[in-house]
Amino acid sequence: MLTSFGEEIEQTPLQLAALMSAIANGGTLYYLQYPANQEEARNFVPRVKRRLDIAGLIPVIEPGMRAAVESGTARRAADDGDIAGKTGTCTENHAHLGWFGSFNETGKRKLVVVVLLTGGRPSIGPVAAGVAGEVYRRLNDTNYFADATPRHGAPALISSQICCQR
């Protein structure tokens, strides 16, 4: 059984994405940067903030994250590719927040997807995993992960509403 419980840990979705990226890449933490326009996106250069000493922990963490997607609370994110992720749910002032942080481990393109949902039931984290799974599935359908050629601009799916019924 995989379980975890956290209270009083505050982070933004971008901070969670940076942490997921560090786990996926072996421990390099990058500065959070958000290109404001297409020109900045074309000229984007990642900046290293620091190296996290987590190399010895990754072989323990990743299998649990994969198991969460394969057979745990994040199974709605399951796709043909190898996805590792972690769900979470928290309550603040009687409002429920559900989140899912993930990364893919197959193909030539690597991607971190973080979804934060508000409202709903106390078990909204698995719903967030379903939304992320739909992102991975739609990108997979366009062969996004098979091609390493640089692409500029956000994929069309980002501007469309994603609804997941799984």
Positions of the model-derived regions?
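Active-site beta-strand/loop architecture of penicillin-binding DD-peptidases
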Residues: 1-49, 56-59, 65-146
